[in-house]
């Protein structure tokens, strides 16, 4: 059978990763030394990796993370920043997501709270988790608008489905009782189902 017929059939199925691997096998004579199962596995694995990378790419687009270049490996552990390196590396393992634990990152302006939160978010996306980043003030505004147009229930459901929600700049301005109640409902809906990271200038006791 002509290989072009096979390629056309692969294209009809939209197996783009499979197609690239198939062409690679045709052009590289070293593949002739592999068994049928080994070559088939290579084709399937290429398609799997292609789909996985597409999901990661899509999750990055939907995450709204501003600094997609933020990575945990570039965190500067200067003494004055008082960062717990072992704790941060532990967070990088994503075990907190698997355990559905929440994180509070607090510190003064310029200490890198947002960078750290986004670096963790970027790592989570690369590990296959869905992530959403939003400033707390923006979320509160979305909640108010959803109350007005009747879409509040759908908004709560939307924020509940992300495996990791990053709420940046919590408490940067005073929050009313209603705002606090609405925010608590969002967080409580996610409790024991997924994880939330909150960055704030406020001490944890506040």
Language-model features: locations:
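Interdomain "pre-motor" coupling segment immediately N-terminal to P-loop NTPase/helicase cores
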Residues: 11, 15-67
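Conserved hydrophobic/aromatic pocket- or pore-lining residues that grip, position, or stack substrates
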Residues: 75, 117, 135
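N-terminal pre-P-loop "Q-motif" helix
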Residues: 75-90
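Phosphate-binding P-loop
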Residues: 92-100
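Residue-level preference for the first positions of well-ordered beta-strands
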Residues: 102-104, 164, 195
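Walker A/P-loop
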Residues: 105-129
């Amino acid at each position: 059978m002509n290989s072009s017929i096979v390629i056309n059939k692969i294209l009809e199925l939209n197996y783009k990763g499979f197609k690239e691997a198939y062409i690679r096998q045709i052009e590289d004579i070293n593949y002739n030394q592999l068994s049928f199962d080994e070559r088939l596995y290579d084709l399937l694995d290429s398609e799997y990796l292609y789909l996985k990378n597409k999901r990661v790419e899509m999750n990055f687009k939907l995450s709204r993370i501003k600094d997609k270049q933020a990575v945990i490996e570039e965190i500067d552990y200067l003494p004055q920043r008082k960062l717990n390196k072992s704790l941060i590396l532990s967070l990088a393992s994503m075990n907190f997501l698997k355990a559905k634990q929440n994180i509070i990152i607090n510190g003064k302006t310029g200490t890198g709270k947002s960078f750290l939160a986004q670096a963790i978010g970027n790592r989570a996306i690369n590990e296959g988790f869905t992530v959403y980043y939003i400033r707390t003030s923006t979320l509160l505004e979305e909640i108010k608008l959803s109350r007005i147009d009747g879409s509040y229930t759908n908004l709560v459901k939307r924020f509940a489905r992300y495996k990791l929600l990053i709420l940046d700049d919590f408490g940067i301005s005073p929050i009313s009782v209603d705002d606090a109640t609405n925010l608590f409902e969002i967080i409580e809906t996610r409790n024991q189902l997924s994880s939330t990271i909150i960055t704030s200038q406020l001490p944890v006791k506040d």
